[in-house]
Amino acid sequence: MILIPAIDLMGKKVVRLTQGEKERKTEYPISPVELALKYQEAGARLIHVVDLDRAFTGESENFEVIAEIIKNVSIPVQVGGGIRDIESFRELIDLGVSRVIVGTIAVTNPELLEEMLTLDRDKVAVGIDAKNGWVAIKGWVESSNYRALDLAYKVKEMGVTTIIYTDIARDGSLTGPNFNETLKLAIDTGLKVIASGGISGLEDLRRWRELGENKIYGVIAGKAILEGKIDLKEGIRILEGES
């Protein structure tokens, strides 16, 4: 199991939202590239980047920032947020992104997801963002008619092997992860699941280590690292088995 630090981008700046709400935004006085380098130096093996502008509006002003992050670090970078056309997918692949995370199109345009899988199956992951078990789309502002588990089974049939599961109610809240729902998704589907949302401190990582060993591929943490609730080096040691 690996600990994956997150960088959320809005207006070329590092931010965190609480429960995905634009109005509940915290800005951090560090450049995205500087933060990525700090994460790499602490021992991260993968960085998770979310383009919030594109998620909300479909337009991105963060492309150059993402390019700079990839240019400056030597570890893989996965990117998500509002990728709803094949051109955006190609652009990110050409940039050197290790994995592109799509969400909304898995619900609204499965044909496009098929096209992406045909282009480069290994570079596609699906983000399943759920509130009370129901999948939310378009930057979490709309609800869908899919239960999280049903969507996971559907994309698995299409050939997706990796999903990022976020419990929206926990995201950016520092209230602790939804262990049960995430584990159920991983065990029932057999997919490679990355857990996201709610990490509040090292105790949550110890719990993931205890419950998720050989079931969960990775855990994403953002706000807890930025606000000093988790020392990234120590978190990596706990989750990856050195303490």
Swiss-Prot record:
Disulfide bonds: none annotated. Its main location: cytoplasm. It is found in: Cytoplasm. GO terms for cellular component: cytoplasm. InterPro entries: Aldolase_TIM, His_biosynth, HisA_bact_arch, Isoase_HisA-like, Isoase_HisA-like_bact, RibuloseP-bd_barrel. The active site is at residues 8, 129. Its EC number is 5.3.1.16. GO terms for molecular function: 1-(5-phosphoribosyl)-5-[(5-phosphoribosylamino)methylideneamino]imidazole-4-carboxamide isomerase activity. Keywords: Amino-acid biosynthesis, Cytoplasm, Histidine biosynthesis, Isomerase. Pathway: Amino-acid biosynthesis; L-histidine biosynthesis; L-histidine from 5-phospho-alpha-D-ribose 1-diphosphate: step 4/9. One of its GO terms (biological process) is L-tryptophan biosynthetic process. Pfam families: His_biosynth. Coiled coil: none annotated. It comes from the Bacteria. It catalyses: 1-(5-phospho-beta-D-ribosyl)-5-[(5-phospho-beta-D-ribosylamino)methylideneamino]imidazole-4-carboxamide = 5-[(5-phospho-1-deoxy-D-ribulos-1-ylimino)methylamino]-1-(5-phospho-beta-D-ribosyl)imidazole-4-carboxamide. Belongs to the HisA/HisF family. This is 1-(5-phosphoribosyl)-5-[(5-phosphoribosylamino)methylideneamino] imidazole-4-carboxamide isomerase. The lineage of its organism: Bacteria, Bacillati, Bacillota, Clostridia, Thermoanaerobacterales.
